[in-house]
């Protein structure tokens, strides 16, 4: 009886890299569309707390028909999950649109109300353009610094977002700690009589 956590997100946002990092295994992390074609589930332990982590097929706007079957197994994992980690490639120019695609897909699956957290990945790749002081044109999204983005999203989502680089292992300790807290909270609600939760820390 373990809490099930699913990594969801647009294709090519770094879900498999995060999976490898958390489970210290080598899921197929490759920079291309649909490198993960079936759902990989692993047992992960953080501070003696075990849970199941599923890496799922990336969502996209229009799914090619030959991938629909692979996608169905992903959807089952998503439906069964207790917690969704929505991974976003913050360095992608259209990341906000990708967030919408994923959220709409989750909505279509009836999973919009599940506990979830947005994980902004690839902060090491994020780039922005500083405006010249005498440039009076309105700032565009290319002019937003990472700190400004963080403030905006933190204000919008409170504690429900993290900014990491799975590849460069930036902010990974805090990421693990946040997952631990969320999984533990869900575990206490779902399986209140599990002994290992009450061991002396």
Question: Which stretches of residues belong to each language-model region?
Answer:
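C-terminal-of-GTPase-core extension/linker across diverse P-loop GTPases
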Residues: 1-13, 19-20, 24, 93, ...
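Conserved G1/Walker A P-loop phosphate-binding module
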Residues: 1-79, 83
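Residues at alpha-helix caps and immediate loop-helix transition turns in enzyme cores, especially N-
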Residues: 67, 97-98
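Conserved Walker B
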Residues: 56-57, 63, 90-91, 122-123
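Generic enzyme active-site microenvironment
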Residues: 53, 87, 119
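Inter-motif core of Ras-like GTPase G domains
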Residues: 67-92, 104-111, 165
């Amino acid at each position: 009886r373990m809490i099930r956590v699913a990594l969801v997100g647009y294709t090519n946002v770094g879900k498999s890299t995060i999976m490898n990092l958390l489970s210290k295994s080598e899921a197929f992390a490759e920079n291309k569309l649909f490198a993960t074609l079936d759902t990989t589930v692993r047992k992960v332990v953080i501070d003696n707390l075990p849970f199941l982590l599923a890496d799922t097929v990336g969502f996209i706007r229009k799914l090619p028909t030959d991938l629909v079957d692979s996608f169905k197994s992903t959807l089952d994992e998503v439906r069964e999950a207790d917690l969704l980690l929505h991974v976003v490639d913050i360095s992608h120019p259209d990341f906000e649109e990708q967030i919408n695609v994923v959220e709409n897909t989750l909505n279509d699956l009836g999973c919009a109300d599940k506990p979830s957290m947005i994980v902004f990945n690839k902060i090491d790749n994020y780039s922005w353009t500083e405006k010249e002081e005498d440039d009076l044109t309105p700032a565009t999204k290319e002019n937003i610094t990472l700190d400004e983005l963080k403030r905006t999203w933190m204000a919008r989502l409170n504690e429900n977002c993290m900014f990491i680089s799975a590849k460069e292992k930036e902010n990974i300790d805090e990421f693990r700690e946040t997952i631990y807290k969320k999984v533990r909270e869900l575990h206490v609600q779902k399986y209140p009589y599990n002994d290992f939760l009450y061991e002396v820390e």
